[in-house]
Regions:
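Active-site catalytic motif of lipid deacylating hydrolases and related acyltransferases
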Residues: 23-96
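C-terminal region of N-terminal signal peptides and the immediate post-cleavage residues
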Residues: 7-26
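Sec-dependent N-terminal signal peptides
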Residues: 1-7
Length: 97
């Protein structure tokens, strides 16, 4: 069983092909805050670590949404939405269980 936690974003995006990795039981898709450096950010890191401590032996994957996280919301938000939607589609296609 694979569960996804995501921000409510949905715009088409093609996910690049990467090396095959085992599917986690739970996949967190996290968009860092505006102005934060690339990655999950401090809140995303804390959330993922807290979740891992609560799910027993289930595996937790973490995906940092790739977007500018800038105050230019007209370009930043759509880019983040596209990347997050692409990751959701990628996980659904490659980790259907």
């Amino acid at each position: 069983m694979c569960a996804a936690v995501s921000v409510p974003l949905a715009v088409p995006f093609a996910m690049p092909v990467a090396a095959a990795q085992p599917c986690p039981d739970i996949e967190v898709i996290f968009a860092r805050g505006t102005g934060a450096p690339a990655g999950l950010g401090w809140l995303g890191d804390e959330f993922v670590e807290s979740l891992r401590g609560k799910v027993g032996d289930r595996t937790v994957g973490a995906y940092a949404v790739n977007y500018p996280a800038s105050f230019d919301f007209d370009t930043s938000a759509p880019a983040g939405a596209a990347d997050a939607a692409g990751r959701v589609r990628y996980m659904a296609d490659n980790c259907p269980d």
